[in-house]
Amino acid sequence: MINRLKVTFSAAAFSLLAGTALAQTPDADSALVQKGAYVARLGDCVACHTALHGQSYAGGLEIKSPIGTIYSTNITPDPTYGIGRYTFAEFDEAVRHGIRKDGSTLYPAMPYPSFSRMTKEDMQALYAYFMHGVKPVAQPDKQPDISWPLSMRWPLGIWRMMFSPSPKDFTPAPGTDPEIARGDYLVTGPGHCGACHTPRGFAMQEKALDAAGGPDFLSGGAPIDNWVAPSLRNDPVVGLGRWSEDDIYTFLKSGRIDHSAVFGGMGDVVAWSTQYFTDDDLHAIAKYLKSLPPVPPSQGNYTYDPSTANMLASGNTASVPGADTYVKECAICHRNDGGGVARMFPPLAGNPVVVTENPTSLVNVIAHGGVLPPSNWAPSAVAMPGYSKSLSAQQIADVVNFIRTSWGNKAPGTVTAADVTKLRDTGAPVSSSGWNSVSSGWSVFLPQPYGSGWTFAPQTHTGQDAAQ
């Protein structure tokens, strides 16, 4: 599932959206169109409905799923190839019900189970934006590359009836703090955070769509494009337990804080979506996430162990697999103490991505590198190089295991050279137990918008959805 797997507008940027030229007609309600542009930001619609180097919302993004390849659709108001002839009822039916204009069910790469709780008011604004604020693009949709019989759509209708709730405007429980209620709506509705951060069941459905659905909600997802979305619950080891509300606010606004930095698929979310949220909405999300208890049993607390830093500083690394590689390739940025450099190179000591059960993200970023994208609030891009060509599979496995067990990190399992080879050569994720397996969920391939490489060159982001 996609999601991009995806949750401030400044006054100047409020009416802008991702590379679109506003095409308002005289009868369009300007305020409603502007509100719809913001709702589209909340849902990060542009991330999935725009192909790499393609025109905004014209579709064509390749999405790898367990049953084959599908392509996002053209949702510009073009009357022939887009949604220009959709009535509001038909638009609402597609977004919140998962049913397209011809009556067939959409592939659940479209997160309509989350969108089902969006308010009718937000839906009307979103419709106004797509009809009057988006430039029409006459680009036909690409047909899915799925073999028969998996290409038949009628089973999707059964899936929808089993796992997608009937659309209903979000209503908070009586007595809920209004700020938490707003955060709940943003996270579980348009933001569809659970599409990536919630584990999936036997039919690839999210195991819980909100906190009422149980402790699986936002407890960490399956690999998507070989990035594992971590837990957003308040576990102090693998979740947000050591994060403050202000940490969450700043992370979503800029993509970086003193003890963490965005990478992988979340880089797209910050670049195209959350950096444009209002401050009030970002604070609401932060307050809501901090209200979620850890999944029992909690893994306790993280305690830093200085013995690794002392060993590295002494130079006695030859007898410790991975330590010598760490000193030569990693310590210059992430330091001997595993503390990194604030707002540039994230710490490895106690990092939830490092100690989480599934090591796929760590293996992937070491093998292929990653990008910390620029934002309006932190306009410098930083990239980590990939080591798949300069280090052997065994060297990568050793340094991964070293990082996961140093500075007080107590990550489970052991990564092998075979795991690294499989991920590097075929794209298969690493399982939690240290052996190769197929991802349980949607495997989505969405390239980083800012490319790759090793760069500290200052960049600016103008609020338009195009790398500057």
UniProtKB/Swiss-Prot annotation:
Q: What is its EC number?
A: 1.1.5.5
Membrane-protein topology = Peripheral membrane protein
Which cofactors is this protein said to need?
Answer: heme c
Q: Which Gene3D superfamilies match?
A: Cytochrome c-like domain (1.10.760.10)
Q: Where does heme c 3 bind?
A: 330, 333-334
Q: So what does this thing catalyse?
A: ethanol + a ubiquinone = a ubiquinol + acetaldehyde
**Highest taxon of the source?**
Bacteria
Q: How does it assemble?
A: The alcohol dehydrogenase multicomponent enzyme system is composed of a dehydrogenase subunit I (AdhA) and a cytochrome c subunit II (AdhB).
Protein name per UniProt: Alcohol dehydrogenase (quinone), cytochrome c subunit
Organism of origin: Gluconacetobacter polyoxogenes (Acetobacter polyoxogenes)
State the organism's lineage.
Answer: Bacteria, Pseudomonadati, Pseudomonadota, Alphaproteobacteria, Acetobacterales
Protein encoded by which gene: adhB
